[in-house]
């Protein structure tokens, strides 16, 4: 599988370890940087990973910064990206199976490298399981990427809120 990987300067060594691990598993890597510990800004590298995935150059992406919050938010701004900040296998699998996530984000200073590798493996092995419900959710999320008239509609999520009120969701 072809995977784009990017990070900021705080977690360069963690990214290098992830890249080495993925290569050892037979994956082709697009290393979007950064490549050293010189101060930089995570949005640059989130954008690069997002563009590689959205364009089809890469099948999936992995982004890493200190907490994971900044770079995951940045990559989510790229149209066509559905990124999830994860810290466990359950969240990673859910993000792929239910939300068709195509990028996962990590806090490289939050979780250890071995756990990160296990979570990446779980994410890569998971497959999207389309249902009518999650297709609708994904469609709604994707429509938020463009300024649309629907987005400004105060009833944008009514369909789902009504189901909640009827007790149709069993979390």
UniProtKB/Swiss-Prot annotation:
EC numbers on record: 5.3.1.26
Annotated signal peptide: none
Enzyme class: isomerase
One example GO MF annotation: ribose-5-phosphate isomerase activity
Pfam families for the chain: LacAB_rpiB (PF02502)
UniProt pathway: Carbohydrate metabolism; D-galactose 6-phosphate degradation; D-tagatose 6-phosphate from D-galactose 6-phosphate: step 1/1
GO biological process: D-allose catabolic process; galactose catabolic process; lactose catabolic process via tagatose-6-phosphate; pentose-phosphate shunt, non-oxidative branch
InterPro entries recorded: LacB (IPR004784), RpiB_LacA_LacB (IPR003500), RpiB_LacA_LacB_sf (IPR036569)
Record's keyword terms, sorted: Isomerase, Lactose metabolism
Reactions catalysed: aldehydo-D-galactose 6-phosphate = keto-D-tagatose 6-phosphate
HAMAP family: LacB
Subunit architecture: Heteromultimeric protein consisting of LacA and LacB.
Family according to the record: Belongs to the LacAB/RpiB family.
Full protein name: Galactose-6-phosphate isomerase subunit LacB 2
Species: Streptococcus pyogenes serotype M28 (strain MGAS6180)
Origin organism lineage: Bacteria, Bacillati, Bacillota, Bacilli, Lactobacillales
Gene: lacB2
């Amino acid at each position: 599988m072809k995977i784009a990987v990017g990070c900021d300067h705080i977690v360069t060594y963690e990214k290098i370890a992830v890249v080495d691990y993925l290569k050892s598993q037979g994956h082709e890597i697009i290393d979007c940087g950064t490549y050293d510990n010189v101060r930089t800004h995570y949005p640059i590298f989130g954008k690069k990973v997002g563009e590689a995935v959205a364009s089809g150059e890469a099948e999936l992406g992995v982004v890493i910064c200190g907490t994971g919050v900044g770079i995951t938010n940045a990559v989510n701004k790229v149209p066509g990206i559905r990124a999830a900040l994860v810290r466990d296998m359950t969240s990673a699998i859910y993000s792929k199976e239910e939300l068709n996530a195509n990028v996962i984000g990590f806090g490289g200073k939050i979780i250890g490298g071995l756990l990160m590798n296990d979570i990446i493996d779980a994410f890569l092995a998971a497959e999207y399981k389309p249902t009518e419900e999650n297709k609708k959710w994904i469609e709604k999320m994707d429509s938020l990427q463009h300024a649309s008239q629907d987005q400004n509609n105060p009833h944008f999520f009514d369909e789902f809120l009504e189901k909640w009120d009827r007790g149709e969701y069993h979390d």
